[in-house]
């Protein structure tokens, strides 16, 4: 465990954070680049677009049957893919017709607070306090995000930083002047720290 780490970018960064939060008995180091945090901001903007796209397709089941036929996942189509994928992960329901619950009503478009509450329970910023002992046990916790992240993840990273500080969780938080894409060069900031901590 003391020599095992995990890192990732975007949704992979989210996964790395969750491994540190929930499985610190297996991992001693975590590095997250632009990981999903503070779901109100990072997913909130896609919700209305997903409503429009799924409704125009004739509902969720019909959209699921046809979405792969699109040449480009641009604009509202990407928003729909994002929200449907997140729904399958954050709000699975084997009794639902498609196996998961959407965070909104397709009929009215209104948000479903009970489903969004399930999502929020998987948001790293909401888990810091309860999992602070696990995070404190890490030999390295690194996270960063560009100040121009298109999914507003820089706000989530900053909130995560403040929550970690409030819970006395040692961590390295960095900001940089860039967006969400093509930031592989940022591994030069995290991997040396992770490597030194795990040797």
Which positions does each model-derived feature cover?
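Non-catalytic cap/lid and distal C-terminal segments of serine-dependent acyl enzymes
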Residues: 1-199
